[in-house]
């Protein structure tokens, strides 16, 4: 199937491998995929070890899908030789709130790190069982030293622009395009939104004529404590 897809398209092709299954990754590299997704949505092959990316020539991505998402798992997993880096993601639901929560938590933790002195950085790295040089590099850069993509729940051009303005380097969109009313138009509009994410006039024009957004989401209403604001939640 992967070979058929590569023969049919000119865009880069990404394929999934199970966590820790380096032989699957070797096979994917040998048949010519452009990226390997060491995917947390598949059943892991190895619960204790991730694939050593230094043994491969192609870039990898991995998921940063954790409660209150924060850098520690990114240090322990995302920097094990990832050329492309971690992505902030949740399974596709059409609800962008999970991706927003994750990237805000990650960026908030990095802001705290930037205010630490060297001794505090050393203690922090030890506390989270991460390599000191990677933690210090993050402090100096003011960001993760790998590219950071948003994925999961991005269903509109405005969603994509939101994730970019929150600090992501790019956006992965699958179901948000292919489960929409007009996939081709929506994909084109989302690409434009990522490119021109700080231009509200262009973003506004891109929201029209896209057909129905991703459907099939069951939501419930939740009132924020102490406010009149009501949120939709995925059940």
Curated annotation (Swiss-Prot):
EC number per UniProt: 4.3.3.6
Alphabetical keyword list: Lyase, Pyridoxal phosphate, Schiff base
InterPro entries assigned to the protein according to its UniProt record, in alphabetical order: Aldolase_TIM, PdxS/SNZ, PdxS/SNZ_N, RibuloseP-bd_barrel
Residues annotated to bind D-glyceraldehyde 3-phosphate: 104
The protein's enzyme class: lyase
Domain of life: Eukaryota
UniProt cross-references to SUPFAM superfamilies, sorted A to Z: Ribulose-phoshate binding barrel
MF terms in GO: pyridoxal 5'-phosphate synthase (glutamine hydrolysing) activity
Pathway in which the depicted protein is active: Cofactor biosynthesis; pyridoxal 5'-phosphate biosynthesis
GO biological-process terms attached to the record: amino acid metabolic process; pyridoxal phosphate biosynthetic process; pyridoxine biosynthetic process
Catalytic machinery residues: 16 (schiff-base intermediate with d-ribose 5-phosphate)
Catalytically driven reaction(s): aldehydo-D-ribose 5-phosphate + D-glyceraldehyde 3-phosphate + L-glutamine = pyridoxal 5'-phosphate + L-glutamate + phosphate + 3 H2O + H(+)
Regions crossing the membrane: none
PROSITE patterns linked to this entry: PDXS_SNZ_1, PDXS_SNZ_2
Residues engaged in binding D-ribose 5-phosphate: 153, 174-175
Similarity remark: Belongs to the PdxS/SNZ family.
Miscellaneous comment in the UniProt entry for this protein: Vitamin B6 is an essential quencher of singlet oxygen in plants, that can protect cellular membranes from lipid peroxidation.
Described purpose of this protein according to its UniProt entry: Catalyzes the formation of pyridoxal 5'-phosphate from ribose 5-phosphate (RBP), glyceraldehyde 3-phosphate (G3P) and ammonia. The ammonia is provided by PDX2. Can also use ribulose 5-phosphate and dihydroxyacetone phosphate as substrates, resulting from enzyme-catalyzed isomerization of RBP and G3P, respectively. Also plays an indirect role in resistance to singlet oxygen-generating photosensitizers.
Protein known as: Probable pyridoxal 5'-phosphate synthase subunit PDX1
Protein species of origin: Stellaria longipes
